[in-house]
């Protein structure tokens, strides 16, 4: 039996627990217990059928007086500490030496070596009852396996926290998405302004100004700069000329090159073809008074653009938020003299015979333009 215990796996020993283990083994049977159904290292006070109190007390004394009971109590306490005590990844797990944690499996193996060295000098490891010896060894092994599983859980938690913190310190993918969306919005406004020459000068100026401010995609126009606006207007005009030529003469010599460039840009950013967006923009600015296509109109637009009805619907939702709503907000800031006219006419052109124009945008209140040129919320 002694050789069977010696064949168990041991780790490097420690000596600080020797005195505590020796005193614990001698005093364990006579330690007073607090009243209650459960006490530390004791089973519930239940009496099995057919056993009197004397025989039950005798069996308890045999367990508490067994040479391996102090080791059983020690591993049980380590399991409790590993379950209840807070664990810091800086002191245990990541980058810490083996056995550095008092509740780790390495420290328990060190305690086994110290306990075996101490107990052999005093008395044998096993008693005269083989059944009780087997029970004690199996109980220690079960708690040992439990301690190993707890340590695995702690290591996984430490590893997850380390990887999560490392990920937070890096650049978030949302930053790349925002940068790409800013560039997409500016290009959409450039193409749209160039493809709609019938827009009033004030609306074209608004688009140029807000292209420089970089706040169009949020719907909050910023202050414009004269030099930047002029430069942006020149660039927009150049791009608009190329776009008009491409649409008016599809069989031109540079069409293939433009299509290849467009395919590469679409593949990189995942946007719709420029021809399709031009068709939908034209419809949007022809129906600014009510930029909500019906189901039949969506089907027709889907056929004209080669997109699905869902893609057409999503594009109009984004366009009302990114184009129509900022134009309405800008017209509210400029005042009555430069109010936004959905039909592209100056405010002085309204007469008493003209109906009121209502502009509704998703996620906001409707706005009513009366005959006096004033905006009212519906």
UniProtKB/Swiss-Prot annotation:
Keywords: DNA-binding, Homeobox, Nucleus. The keyword DNA-binding applies. It holds the Pfam family Homeobox_KN. Residues 32-43 have a biased composition (Pro residues). GO terms for biological process: negative regulation of apoptotic signaling pathway; positive regulation of phosphatidylinositol 3-kinase/protein kinase B signal transduction. CDD domains: homeodomain. It comes from the Eukaryota. This is Homeobox protein Meis3.
